[in-house]
Amino acid sequence: KGIESFMAKNADKWLRKNKGYTELVLERAKSRHKFQMLKDASKKGRKAKRQRVEKLLDANERRRRELCTLFICEGDSAIGGLRSARNKLYQGGIALKGKPMNVAQSNIKDILANQEFTNIMASIGLTLGQPAELSDLRFSNIVFLADSDVDGGHINTLLTNFFFTFWPELFVAGAIQIAKAPLYE
């Protein structure tokens, strides 16, 4: 117990005197942790790319994927309307269950555990921690299709936040769009 108390007392003094070293060690530990999380995310993302997404209405075009559009819809009722109105050759769709999570307040582990985001990434061919190459994606256009109400606006904002946080190059390329649904009274 004497050695333990001596070490604790002197280690505390040393750490207070040498704050630069302490901060450096903490920064490196955080950096290693973030790198490991991105590495795990990349591995899980590559695995997810090979998965079949149950709720995906896929486009039938296989060769010219640059012509394909994915509609991310608010709920099963919206996807039902899309199912009958879409051009099956070039248009696909996936329905969200409720509001997606806010990635600004989440860590990578939570995002990867979120089934909605995992399905979206697998449907498009995106991987967290890797830039999006339009030529490699299953859909080169992504359209958010939500109701014209407060919830729909919030869903569009959360989806925009998700894509812009991890793949801002999709916005630069003009691949992300928001459909303005008509308002019925």
Q: Where on the chain are the PLM-derived regions?
A:
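A short acidic, often aromatic-flanked loop/helix-cap motif at beta-alpha or helix-coil junctions
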Residues: 101-103
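C-terminal interaction appendages of subunits in large macromolecular complexes
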Residues: 33-47, 68-69, 84-85, 105-185
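GHKL-family ATPase ATP-binding module
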Residues: 1-99, 132-134, 141
